[in-house]
Amino acid sequence: MGKLQPDIKEETYQKAISKIKNLKDELTLDLICNTLYDMFENWNFFGFYVKKTNELEILSYTSDQIPCSPINMNGVCGQSFNSKKIIIVPDVSKFHGHIECDPNSKSEITIPFLNYVLDIDSRELDDFDKIDKKYLKKIIEMI
């Protein structure tokens, strides 16, 4: 498996966006989850959390494991939601407050928007970068 080379990663995102655009009329969070999860072999979790009172609850996901839900606001997702900033965690074992739902998760990216957080975990260390950030923001804008 291993990390994707930047040019392959860009190409994969472009294909994913094309597929998602073709589904625009019936676009749902489940379709986005399934489309992207299927295209990136390293990912072991792709999901959307929604803010409910003082916690985040899973709304839609595709995963190797059942997700943790609800989760507190101290983990990566909660910090991303509260700061309204994208967070890239190269090594989740070194992130204070990381909530471990799957022991195979090695790195993570979170993208907050509206009352939600997109959370993606990878089996590879340092798997997320500016390419992921760029294309995931584009996908969020399509919702």
Predicted regions located by residue number:
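Short loop/turn motifs at secondary-structure junctions and domain boundaries
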Residues: F40, I99-S105
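Regulatory sensory and allosteric helical modules in signal-transduction proteins
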Residues: K51-C101, D129
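A short, aliphatic-rich beta-strand micro-motif
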Residues: K106-L114
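Intrinsically disordered, low-complexity terminal regulatory regions
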Residues: M1-P67
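Juxtadomain coupling helices with adjacent low-complexity linkers
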Residues: G2-Q5, K9, Y13, I17-K21, ...
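Histidine-centered metal-chelating micro-motifs
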Residues: I87, E108, L125
